[in-house]
């Protein structure tokens, strides 16, 4: 916005046109005119919108309503919504519910909100994710949402809040590595731990999983590790990324010497090495001082007894329902927060 305003003031342009930014927030011009820039939902530049062009649809990672404008929204109704989990899905659900005129209580077990967004926001190469996190923190602060951090959520606590509807957004946990009959590796670490702590690792590093998290952790370690090898069983690393962004991301990693093995699968571990089945079907031994797991997530539901013990409607959203990406998390959060209380399930 500052750059656009400067161009207009200098007379360098008569009009500044925006594309993806207006998909992320169609109200951007109005909010800018009202000097309310912090309320503008930022575009991530993730090109999710471009991915849907081929099927003649428009979607947006951060704007779940894009392409769904004609969907009927229930009339505002009173009621108390309790949201468990302050990650992207939970934050979106809480804001959507508050916007429908409901009393909202948000419970988060950590000392700060954001969940997986905090991991992405820590990248210098991803400044838009920090802006998105700031946007959510600003919006929940403005909304009349009761936020409880460092919350130990249990059945008694939820019952005491007397919710009319419960939205569970407790996220997922890293998928473990299961290799029957394999020798345990001496140094195994989850990729999410490295992204959270920015731990520096040296020596020969093998990353199992070439999804977005695998690419992120390889980027973090590329300046300290002697050599990084990514093992990906699919035909393309970073397959969730839009094609042009994926090409740039992979080119950057290769520039730092990261080796990416496609159509390859880890078949067993040794104390300081791994054995991989390569595309030709042969076995290949790779030195691995550190084994980093980026195998995705599995749902986490720390309160399985809630479903039976509480009579109020309950909705599971985000990774605790089905691990996916930010687009799915925010879409499920918006839908759950907007739904009629009697229809949450």
Region spans (language model):
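Flavin-dependent oxidoreductase catalytic cores
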Residues: 1-84, 88, 92, 96-99, ...
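Short, structured coil segments at secondary-structure junctions
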Residues: 11-12, 143, 162, 183-184, ...
């Amino acid at each position: 916005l500052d750059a656009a305003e400067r161009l207009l003031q200098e007379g360098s342009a008569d009009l500044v046109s925006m594309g993806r930014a207006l998909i992320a927030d169609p109200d951007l011009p109005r909010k800018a005119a009202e000097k309310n820039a912090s309320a503008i939902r930022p575009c991530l530049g993730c090109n999710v919108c471009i991915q849907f062009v081929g099927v003649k649809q428009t979607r947006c990672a951060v704007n779940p309503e894009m392409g769904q404008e004609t969907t009927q929204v229930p009339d505002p109704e009173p009621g108390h919504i309790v949201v468990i989990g302050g990650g992207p899905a939970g934050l979106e659900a809480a804001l959507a519910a508050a916007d429908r005129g409901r009393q909202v209580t948000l419970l988060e077990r950590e000392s700060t909100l954001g969940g997986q967004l905090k991991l992405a926001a820590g990248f210098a190469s991803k400044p838009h994710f920090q802006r998105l996190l700031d946007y959510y923190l600003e919006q929940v602060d403005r909304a009349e949402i009761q936020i409880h951090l460092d919350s130990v959520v249990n059945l008694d606590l939820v019952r005491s809040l007397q919710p009319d509807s419960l939205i569970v957004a407790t996220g997922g946990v890293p998928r473990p590595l299961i290799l029957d009959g394999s020798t345990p590796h001496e140094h195994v670490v989850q990729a999410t731990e490295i992204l959270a702590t920015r731990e520096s690792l040296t020596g020969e590093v093998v990353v199992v999983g070439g999804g977005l998290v695998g690419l992120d952790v390889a980027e973090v370690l590329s300046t300290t590790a002697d050599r990084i090898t990514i093992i990906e069983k699919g035909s393309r690393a970073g397959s969730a990324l839009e094609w042009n962004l994926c090409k740039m991301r992979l080119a950057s990693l290769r520039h730092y010497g990261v080796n990416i093995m496609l159509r390859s699968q880890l078949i067993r571990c040794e104390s300081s090495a791994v054995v991989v089945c390569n595309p030709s079907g042969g076995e290949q031994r790779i030195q691995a001082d550190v084994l980093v797991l980026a195998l995705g997530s599995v749902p986490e539901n720390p309160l399985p007894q809630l479903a039976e013990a509480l009579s109020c409607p309950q909705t599971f959203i985000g990774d605790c329902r089905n691990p996916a990406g930010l687009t799915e998390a925010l879409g499920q959060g918006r839908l759950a927060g907007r739904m009629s209380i009697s229809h949450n399930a």
